[in-house]
């Protein structure tokens, strides 16, 4: 079974070596249980810091996107090196390169591909290209909520929803500026819909329980394509 794991840039913002150790062991557990795994990394605070500085001196959005892409690739290299023998030792810079790397049978780790495209969209694209029917989005909350649980306290997790439900929740909260993408952007949603890819949103602090989460035995949100 093929699976793509999208790791939020916030995972790297914590500067926590234990996060990387748990990620490595979780990927090893997945591969030992017959999963083919691809990983897409976000840019996190490294991307935002460079984008902020560049924007303040008047650099255009396309170039800001490039800074974000290279930050996400730096995180991809960190994950790739930490996986050691599990990973194919190349970070692809395009969908074509991902497909070629995927053919070698090892874990492929990538960051962004091109300006104007979030790493969530990249994750959806590589899920489609690898015939993965599940895309796992690992972020710093347990799943999808009606409102941001990091801001509001009176919110409940939505365990099951459709991509149409997600659109309504995200309506008005998405930005197309470099460094501001959250969860799934409209392009990512369209891709998972056209290829009928199930999305599981989980907390990256629970990666050690990812198999249980995939079985629906742990807290997460499952987004079904419509």
Curated annotation (Swiss-Prot):
Pathway: Pyrimidine metabolism; CTP biosynthesis via de novo pathway; UDP from UMP (UMPK route): step 1/1
GO terms assigned for molecular function: ATP binding; UMP kinase activity
Ligand binding (UMP): 43, 65, 113-119
Record entry for activity regulation: Inhibited by UTP.
First-level EC class: transferase
Pfam families: AA_kinase
Keyword Nucleus: no
EC number: 2.7.4.22
Lineage: superkingdom: Archaea
Record-level GO BP terms: 'de novo' CTP biosynthetic process; UDP biosynthetic process
InterPro entries given in the database record: AceGlu_kinase-like_sf, Asp/Glu/Uridylate_kinase, Uridylate_kinase, Uridylate_kinase_arch/spir
Keyword Transferase applies: yes
Subcellular location: Cytoplasm
Record key words, sorted: ATP-binding, Cytoplasm, Kinase, Nucleotide-binding, Pyrimidine biosynthesis, Transferase
Binding-site positions, ATP: 6-10, 44, 48, 139-140, 145, 148
Main subcellular location: cytoplasm
Recorded GO CC terms: cytoplasm
Catalytic activity as recorded in UniProt: UMP + ATP = UDP + ADP
Function: Catalyzes the reversible phosphorylation of UMP to UDP.
NCBIfam families per record: pyrH_arch
Similarity comment: family membership: Belongs to the UMP kinase family.
Subunit architecture: Homohexamer.
Protein name: Uridylate kinase
Protein's organism: Saccharolobus islandicus (strain L.S.2.15 / Lassen #1)
């Amino acid at each position: 079974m093929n699976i793509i794991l999208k790791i939020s840039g916030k995972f790297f913002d914590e500067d926590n070596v234990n996060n990387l150790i748990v990620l490595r062991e979780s990927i090893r557990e997945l591969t030992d249980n017959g999963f083919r795994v691809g990983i897409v990394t976000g840019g996190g605070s490294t991307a935002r810091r460079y984008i902020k500085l560049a924007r303040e001196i008047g650099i255009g959005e396309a170039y800001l996107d490039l800074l974000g892409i290279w930050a996400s690739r730096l995180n991809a290299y960190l994950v790739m090196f930490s996986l050691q023998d599990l990973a194919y030792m190349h970070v692809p810079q395009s969908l074509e390169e991902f497909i070629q790397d995927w053919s070698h049978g090892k874990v492929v780790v990538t960051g962004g591909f091109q300006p104007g495209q979030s790493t969530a969209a990249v994750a959806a694209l590589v899920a489609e290209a690898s015939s993965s029917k599940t895309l796992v989005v690992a972020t710093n909350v347990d799943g999808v909520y009606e409102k941001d649980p990091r801001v509001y306290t009176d919110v409940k997790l939505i365990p099951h929803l459709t991509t149409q439900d997600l659109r309504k929740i995200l309506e008005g909260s998405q930005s197309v500026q470099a460094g501001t993408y959250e969860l799934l952007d409209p392009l990512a949603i369209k891709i998972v819909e056209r290829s009928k890819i199930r999305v599981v949103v989980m907390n990256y602090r629970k990666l050690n329980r990812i198999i249980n989460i995939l079985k629906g035995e742990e807290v997460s949100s499952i987004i079904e394509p419509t």
